[in-house]
Amino acid sequence: MRQFTYNDIEVGSRLYEALVHQARATAGAPIEYGDLLTLARSLHPKDAVLGRAVPVGIGMKLLFVEAFCASHGYPNLACLAVNKTSKRPGPGYKGDWEAERRAVARFDWNATDLQLSTFAASTRAAVPARFKPRKERPADVAWYAYFCSHRAACAQVTQEDKQEIINLMMAGLDPESALERVLAAKDEFGSAS
C-alpha cells in the first residue's frame, strides 16, 4: 500500500462525510467520482484543498476511507464511489459489491465522526517527515521546471492530471513521484471522471 499524504487525509475525510451523506440520502446508491467531489464541495464550499481536488486523484482518498472503515470493522463506505464509465468501484475493489452497498445503507453512521477525527490524526502523524507541505505557487513553478526538462515523460499529462500533480506536490511529493502516482492512478482507475 502506498503512503498517504496530508492531501489524501484531508480530502479523504471530506469524501467520507460526503459518502455518509450519500448512504443516508440514497440508501446506498452508487455515486460517480466527479459527482462525489461535487457533493463534498457542496458540504464544504470554503474548503480550498477540496476545491482543488480532481477525479484522477480520488483513488488514494478512497483508500483512506476504506482504511478507516476496515480499522473499525465498518462496512466499506468507499464502495459507493464508482467509475463514470464502468459504474463500478475501481479495479482494486475486492468484495461483494451489492452486499457491501446494502451493509453501508443499513449501517448507523451517526457515531463515527469522532472516530474519523482520531483516525485522521493518527494517520497524519504517520506521514513521513519528507512529505513537507508547500504552497501552490512554488509547487506550480517546480512542476513547470520538471515538465520543461521531461517533456517526453509528461506527454500524456492532461490539465486535470497537472492539477492533481500540483496537489500532490503541495502535499510534499517531489515532481517525479507525483507524476508517477498520477500515471499509476490513471492506469488503475482509467478515466476516473
Model-identified regions with their sequence ranges:
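Nucleic acid-binding interface residues in structured DNA/RNA-binding domains
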Residues: 1-15, 24-138
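N-terminal intrinsically disordered, low-complexity, charged/polar
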Residues: 1-14, 172-173, 178, 182-193
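Active-site-proximal segments of catalytic enzyme domains
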Residues: 18
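Charged/polar low-complexity intrinsically disordered segments, enriched in acidic residues
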Residues: 131-179
